[in-house]
Regions:
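Accessory carbohydrate-recognition regions in carbohydrate-active enzymes
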Residues: 86-483, 487-530, 536-605, 617-636, ...
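ATP-dependent phospho-/nucleotidyl transfer catalytic cores
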Residues: 610
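Short, low-complexity, Lys/Arg-enriched N-terminal segments of secretory-pathway carbohydrate enzymes
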Residues: 1-35, 66-80
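Membrane-interface motif at the C-terminal end of an N-terminal transmembrane signal
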Residues: 49-70, 79
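Mature N-terminal, pre-catalytic/accessory segment of carbohydrate-active enzymes
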Residues: 21, 31-38, 55, 66-68, ...
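Hydrophobic membrane-insertion alpha-helices, especially the h-region
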Residues: 39-53
Length: 852
């Protein structure tokens, strides 16, 4: 249902009586009054009919606000009664976000939906939070932070660890807010902080402190969260509100005790019992007890602490221990407290004001009749002093809770409003703008503003250093499309993000694969090569090109330590940095041997692509001999093609075939046969020409091998058009866009993977996709909507995608004109897109010859 940005609806005429003529009035006046009354009646009847039609189309099935909210706000509601529809909105409130995918509306104070933003209004922060199993969920949470924020704050309904997020929309209790650094559902948490408020008895145990809520009381957006928690019938309620900046959470608690003698309190959990995954299944978890410190300062009216929780520390433990890693926090309160204590291993210790150890929390109690408390929680990876400084810089005491959501919303609006759409249904707008928001979360900021300039904790050096740093790099996923999307919509960030991975190379010896504070060795390939090639190709500034080439060259020519000893299996613990595991035999044989290394088929194909990316970098840097060698090596994919089966297949070190089912990462031999994004003409020739290739694609799709939940499938529908079958690209891209994405909590068919799933949708909605991202080109598909306009912040120019009829189901392209000139090529270089202009697509309901 549509998001409505309206002022409170005024009372209808039925709520007021219209006075008749008083006694003794003359009949002409009475007649005039009757005529006037008739005119007024006709006018208001017409108005009511008009209002009914609008409301019926927009507000259908919206429930009224809960009755206890009426009591709490104590403001009186205006009401309009239209047929069977009742809509109650308190003065000063709007429908700030009306669609959570659960059929319920949400109201919000107007101050929290400012500034006006079409893009922000359509974001459903619960999209991607559904799914009964980790791999059936988008792994998203209703978090609050600005784009690329260091710490995301979210209500916590469950304890998070690898394979579990801290919030699930099926839960009925909230256990507090958590400031989280968990970048994806299959990655671990690093240094969280939890805060919880209640009435009466102080309870710190996670399960016992949970408070029930009603889903209709919940309001969530990228910049503000609100809910009403029930402490108990004889105890009272707590209204919780939360916003955040990059490094500071801003929380307000409004206490409504059933008795004046009941005191409110706030708990801050610094260390907890959590879990480490030893293996690749959720049941492979074992308990893990991080260390923590807590201090309740009655004089400064602060609570301070730190913990060293890193759930992924076992993956590259010996080489990159990051022994001094700590996440620090400082909490400041708007109201004075005179009592406090700690909880150690579940035991409450009143008046003990500091402690260190496992399963540790601190708490403060407020005097009776304390109705409202604001808390500012600064977070830092540098020090307690820096956590305090972050509060001063981002949310000083003079800043109200209304100002923080407005500031954060403004940052989201600056990005989301770059996109405008015409002809899209409300559900499509929710998918589109939520996808946009999902692409702007990772990687997240690690660097912090200090008196000495920008600094960050380096897990590689295990100390604080100067510079810019990001974490949460899921490069195996995001190199495919999310990186290209950020070049379009966040170019001011990209140079720093590339410099960050170069810093990782300088500090840790290698470019990252999957960085979560430090390298984790998750996934395969050295796809940072592609990020660098792409950035160089489009002319991104802000990073050292020479150092970047040195890093890429090392990836391409230097095997990792113990390369001939280890298999480097998925989530194998205590290994050195993996990078291109199996590079020793890849250089010798042309492929990674399956009897020597895990995931060998995927590695071989990924390394071939990475050689292609490295060759682009070498060309740009003038290293012609290296470029020629790498370009030749990029054809190593041919070593895996089995002419007898017509599929790619992993091989053993003696040259024998390993079997079709062995050696793959998040895919099968069908998907990986098509995993040659950089040389599609060569692959088509290898498979016997376009006709055979298209037949293989048909069987791949029709037999259910294209699992869009896994990234190796993302480019595959765009391969049809490269084999002169454009209509099949147009059909399958549209079908995937409709089947694997929707506006509900179950709106993602698989893990979001740090924005890659959403980047696919955004590009596809525009009618193009970066099949070969390192080369900075786009393969054309067909737009989803009648008109889509993207403003490019680097130039201020607009790319107008016009495709009349696309919104009503026309998916076939008859012709494309760019700025009035016919465009026949199905591949478009980045510089054409960067120039802006009008892309006029002529759409039809049956397939055409364009693109053949």
């Amino acid at each position: 249902m549509a998001v409505i940005r309206r002022r409170p609806i005024t009372p209808s005429i039925s709520d007021h009586s219209i006075p008749g003529p008083s006694a003794g009035q003359r009949r002409p006046q009475q007649k005039l009054w009757r005529r006037s009354r008739l005119l007024l009646f006709l006018f208001f009847s017409a108005s009511l009919f008009w209002l009914y039609n609008i409301a019926s189309s927009v507000f259908e099935n919206l429930p009224s606000l809960a009755s206890r909210d009426t009591q709490r706000f104590n403001e009186g509601f205006t009401k309009i009664r239209l047929s069977d529809l009742e809509l109650d909105i308190p003065p000063g409130y709007v429908i700030g976000h009306a669609d959570f995918g659960d059929g319920r509306s949400r109201t919000c104070k107007k101050e929290f939906v400012q500034p006006q933003s079409e893009g922000c209004n359509w974001v459903n922060v619960n999209l991607g939070n559904g799914g009964s199993e980790p791999n059936l969920s988008g792994g998203m949470i209703p978090s609050v932070a600005p784009p690329f924020g260091m710490t995301r704050w979210t209500p916590q309904t469950r304890e998070n660890y690898v394979s579990m997020c801290p919030y699930n929309q099926t839960d009925t209790k909230i256990h507090g807010f958590i400031g989280t650094h968990q970048p994806a559902i299959w990655m671990g948490e690093s240094g969280p902080v939890e805060i919880h408020a209640s009435l009466g008895e102080v309870i710190t145990d996670f399960e016992k402190r949970g408070l029930t809520f009603k889903r209709e009381d919940e309001y969530a957006s990228p910049n503000y969260y609100r809910n009403l928690l029930d402490v108990g019938k004889d105890i009272g309620d707590v209204e919780i509100e939360m916003s955040a900046t990059s490094r500071v959470g801003h929380i307000r608690y409004t206490f409504d005790p059933s008795s004046e003698s009941i005191k409110p309190h706030v708990v801050l959990q610094t260390s907890r019992k959590t879990w480490i995954l030893h293996g690749d299944q959720p049941d492979d978890k074992v308990p893990y007890y991080p260390n923590g410190y807590i201090e309740v300062d009655l004089e400064k009216q602060e609570v301070r602490g730190w913990n060293d929780e890193r759930q992924d520390h076992v993956l590259v433990g010996d080489e990159l221990p990051a022994k001094n890693f700590k996440s620090y926090f400082v909490a400041r309160f708007s109201q004075p407290f005179s009592e406090g204590g700690i909880s150690h291993a579940g035991k409450i210790q009143p008046n003990v004001l500091r402690g260190q150890g496992k399963v540790l929390a601190g708490y403060v109690q407020f005097p009776e009749n304390t109705k409202e408390v604001e808390v500012r929680v600064g977070v830092s990876f540098i020090s307690l002093e820096q956590a305090s400084r972050n509060i001063d810089l981002e949310i000083p005491s003079s800043q109200s809770l209304a100002q923080t959501p407005q500031s954060t919303r403004s940052q989201w609006a600056d990005k989301l409003d770059l996109l405008s759409v015409e002809g899209a249904a409300p559900s499509n707008l929710t998918v589109l703008y939520t996808s946009f928001a999902h692409t702007l979360v990772y990687p997240y900021e690690m660097s912090e503003p200090t008196p000495q300039g920008s600094m960050y904790y380096s897990g590689y050096l295990d100390k604080v250093v100067s510079g810019i740093s990001y974490s949460g790099y899921s490069i195996w996923d995001t190199f495919r499309a999310q990186s290209a999307w950020l070049i379009l919509v966040a170019p001011e960030r990209v140079g720093g993000m590339i410099q960050s991975i170069i810093q990782d190379y300088k500090e840790g010896g290698w470019l990252p694969m999957w960085k979560n504070v430090v390298e984790t060795n998750i996934m395969v390939g050295s796809h940072a090569d592609s990020l660098i090639a792409q950035a160089m190709k489009v002319g991104v500034k802000g990073f050292d090109y020479q150092e970047a080439w040195q890093a890429v060259r090392k990836n391409a020519f230097t095997p990792p330590d113990r390369d001939t000893e280890l298999r480097f299996a998925d989530r194998e613990e205590g290994t050195p940095q993996e990078v291109r595991a199996g590079l020793t035999e890849y250089k010798k044989l042309g492929y990674v041997a399956d009897d020597l290394h895990s995931e060998s088929g995927s590695r071989t194909l990924d390394y071939a692509y990475d050689d292609h990316a490295a060759a682009i970098v070498a060309d740009i840097m003038g290293a012609t001999e290296d470029a020629a060698l790498l370009r030749e090596r990029s054809k190593n994919y041919k070593y895996l093609y089995n002419n007898q089966t017509g599929h790619m297949e992993a091989r053993n070190s003696d040259g024998s075939w390993a079997g079709q089912e062995k050696g793959w990462t998040e895919g099968d031999h069908w998907a990986y046969t098509l995993d040659v994004m950089h040389d599609v003409p060569g692959l088509i020739d290898l498979m016997g020409g376009e006709s055979n290739f298209v037949d293989f694609l048909d069987r791949h799709f029709e037999r259910g091998h294209n699992l869009h939940t896994n990234e190796p499938s993302h480019h595959i529908p765009y391969m049809y058009i490269l084999a002169s079958a454009p209509h099949r690209t147009q059909e399958w891209v549209r079908r995937i866009g409709e089947s694997d994405y929707n506006h509900t909590a179950d709106g993602l068919s698989g893990n979001e993977d740090c924005g890659q799933m959403s980047a696919w949708y955004l590009f596809s909605a525009m009618g193009l996709y970066p099949v070969d991202p390192a080369n900075a080109t786009y393969v054309l598909g067909a737009p989803f909507f009648d008109k889509l306009t993207l403003t490019l912040p680097s130039t201020g120019k607009n790319v107008e995608i016009k495709a009349k009829g696309a919104s009503s189901g026309m998916k076939y392209v008859k012709n494309l004109q760019i700025d009035g000139v016919d465009h026949e090529d199905v591949v478009v270089p980045h510089d054409v897109l960067e120039k802006g202009g009008v892309w006029e697509w002529e759409m039809r309901g049956d397939h055409q010859v364009w693109g053949m």
